[in-house]
Amino acid sequence: MKDIETLRKELSELDLKIIELVHRRQVLSEEVGAIKREKGRPTRDYQREKLVIELAKSHAKELGVDPSMVVDLMQLLIQSSLKTQESARVKEEGQGNGKRVLVIGGLGRMGAWFAEFMSMQGYEVHIADINLDKEDDSHFINWANTNDDYDITVIATPLRQSIEILEKILETGRRGMLFDIASIKSPIKEILSKISEKGMKVTSIHPMFGPDTDLLTGKHVVFMNLDDHGTHLEIMKLHDFKMLSLIHI
């Protein structure tokens, strides 16, 4: 009989091989994703996912392995593959090209999500947040102290703070496009309309998902048309990927 240390060594070797196989699977998944993008196919293929799960479940039963555990494992692998493919699609189809974005509230959970999302698309992202400890060339404690030379300004702060920011913008003006992500629109609808009436490019969106979302397939984003500049259409282009459903109101 083998001693426990020998058995543990064999287990460790198997663990490393499993990780190597996961890496190989990720590489193959990236290649599949590239073909999907080239042929204009959506990231997610539910029929293929079902086939993968059923094959894994069947093989698990043949080996006497708990099928539910194997299904959980395969779902994790599928999610990881989809995330890899989505990230590649966002980067490839992104429209940033070095344009500048200011995310007000960029240390918050949704603010950080948008900062990363837009950075992936090639935007130069700056962050303004009152919770910053110190400032540098791309991080600011007070958004009002930033230069007004951003192509896009994102307001990703709590509602009360968003109202204060929008009131200040109404007073001082803001170049470039502007949008907020508040989930409740009624308290800010009037001030957004006033901002639009002053000729600024403004829209309002509501992501129908939370900051923990790293897989956009099947998710929805609501867009409000607030001005005559087609700002909502321009901002929609930032999210115009095959995995997202865009709702225009």
Predicted features, each with a name:
Residues 247-249:
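Conserved small/polar residues in nucleotide/adenosyl-binding loops
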